[in-house]
């Protein structure tokens, strides 16, 4: 745990800047280590068990989902200093490199935020089988099927570069296969909800990386 006490008043300007940079890096790393596994686990619970959870009702479904999330969050917070024991230190080159994934993540977020309402982001359509919802195929969803997950990966990569903790590099690597598993589960559920329309959409639009056609290159 990083500590900032009265002693910092005797440090020179450069030392104070380094100290506060350490604090920022540490708490940014905590944010990712806490948020990413909890978010991924939520979908790993919702998607495989969505039919069972629907029968329980929305309130009970969220209570069921919350139990493993709370346990995981508590475990991460308890072992946070062990998880962050390997610190490679502030690296200004990597911090500069983090701008690229951060910028791409922001661009993707701005392009999909109007389509993803809060109920969609917390899994309400999956947990309420009677509400089919709307299949998103316009805007960025006309180029990639899962912009939200691509955005998440870019955020994690940016934070890994900026904080330069081993745990965040490992989190980035582990997130890739886990997100792909979540995507496969999500697509199975979407096929159940939208049938042929979603299958046709999958044939037209790639999952993660947009198609670059000769026409789009010429237009650019």
Question: What is each residue range found by the language model?
Answer:
Residues 3, 10-137, 155-220:
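Membrane-anchoring alpha-helices and their flanking helix-loop junctions
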Residues 137-138, 142-150:
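Histidine-centered phosphotransfer motif of kinases
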């Amino acid at each position: 745990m990083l500590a900032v006490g009265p002693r910092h008043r005797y440090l020179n300007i450069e030392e104070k800047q380094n100290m506060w940079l350490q604090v920022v890096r540490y708490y940014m790393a905590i944010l990712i280590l806490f948020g990413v596994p909890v978010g991924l686990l939520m979908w790993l619970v919702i998607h495989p068990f969505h039919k069972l959870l629907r029968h329980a009702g929305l309130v009970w479904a969220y209570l069921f989902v919350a139990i493993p999330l709370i346990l995981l969050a508590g475990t991460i917070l308890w072992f946070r200093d062990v998880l962050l024991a390997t610190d490679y230190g502030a690296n200004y080159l990597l911090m500069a490199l983090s701008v690229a994934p951060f910028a791409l993540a922001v661009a993707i977020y701005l392009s999909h935020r109007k389509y993803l309402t809060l109920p969609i982001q917390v899994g309400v359509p999956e947990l309420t089988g009677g509400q089919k919802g709307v299949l998103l195929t316009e805007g960025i969803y006309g180029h990639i099927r899962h912009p939200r997950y691509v955005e998440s990966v870019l955020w994690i990569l940016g934070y890994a570069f900026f904080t330069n903790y081993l745990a965040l590099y490992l989190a980035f690597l582990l997130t890739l296969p886990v997100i792909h598993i979540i995507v496969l589960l999500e697509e199975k559920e979407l096929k159940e909800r939208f049938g042929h329309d979603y299958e046709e959409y999958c044939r037209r639009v790639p999952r993660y990386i947009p198609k670059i056609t000769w026409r789009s290159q010429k237009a650019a």
